[in-house]
């Protein structure tokens, strides 16, 4: 999981922003025993790059006066928003880093990459005016784990781990007072190939038992191709508020629930 935190209102000097980030890293370690990475900068794009820079336990600050030099040296595949396919296209064009990208005009980038060209033009210059949106509606609730060692699909431990993930998702979605209508199982194999399998339901669920039942049904139809598992994930999506179900229930269903 990751999140953005805007500490620019009121204006906070960057030294205090870094202190906040360090406190968050410390609290995560104390509460969970897990390391985390944090990045501090003056916009979302650069903060994201900073947080990714020295994972899994990094802390990077990109100041405004240092941003252009940082971006110019950054390999193009490390740019947030530039995926594997686009980075390969850029490398074929001779664009290997941020400096190379910055040599192309806005017209050239939009001609090649259409609407994305404007974003690439700005990112190469450290420009990102997107606001932090702290109140975005959550679209899914998920839990996943990278295993301490690889397991075969038919090992009992796989079922036990999935059971724990289902319980975690159930507890979190209940806390949000939500229900999910789509259940997704995610598996990453030892060769780093990844598959997801989903099932959509007529009504929302949140209970541990309901989530587990659907996940186990999905698991039965997985072909592992004799590969062992290194990561498991469970997600509930297509979320609705619990209150919405009260408005859709019929009188007959309501009377049945009272019996």
Where are each of the predicted segments found?
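DNA-contacting surface of Y-family translesion DNA polymerases
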Residues: 88-229, 239-255
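Short, internal active-site loops enriched in acidic
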Residues: 9-11, 42-47, 188-192, 237-242
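Nucleic-acid-contacting surfaces of polymerase cores and analogous helical-repeat interfaces
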Residues: 2-147
């Amino acid at each position: 999981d990751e999140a953005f935190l805007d500490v620019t209102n009121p204006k906070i000097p960057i030294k205090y922003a870094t202190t906040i980030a360090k406190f968050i890293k410390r609290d995560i370690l104390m509460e969970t025993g897990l390391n985390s990475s944090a990045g501090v900068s003056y916009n979302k794009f650069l903060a994201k790059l900073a947080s990714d820079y020295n994972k899994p336990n990094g802390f990077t600050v990109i100041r405004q006066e240092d941003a252009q030099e940082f971006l110019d040296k950054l390999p193009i595949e490390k740019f947030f928003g530039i995926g594997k396919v686009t980075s390969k296209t850029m490398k074929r064009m001779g664009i290997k880093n941020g400096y190379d990208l910055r040599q192309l005009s806005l017209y050239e980038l939009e001609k090649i990459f259409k609407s994305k060209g404007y974003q690439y033009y700005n990112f190469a210059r450290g420009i990102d005016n997107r606001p932090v949106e702290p109140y975005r509606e959550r679209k899914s609730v998920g839990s996943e784990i990278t295993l301490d060692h690889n397991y075969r699909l038919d090992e009992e431990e796989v079922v036990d781990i999935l059971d724990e993930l289902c319980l975690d998702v159930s507890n979190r979605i209940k806390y949000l007072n939500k229900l999910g209508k789509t259940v997704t199982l995610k598996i990453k194999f030892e060769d780093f190939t990844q598959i997801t399998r989903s099932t959509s339901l007529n009504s929302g669920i949140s209970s541990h038992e309901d989530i587990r039942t659907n996940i186990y049904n999905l698991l039965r139809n997985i072909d592992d191709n004799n590969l062992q598992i290194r990561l498991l994930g469970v997600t509930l999506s297509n979320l609705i508020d619990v209150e919405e179900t009260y408005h859709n229930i019929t009188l007959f269903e309501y009377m049945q629930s009272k019996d």
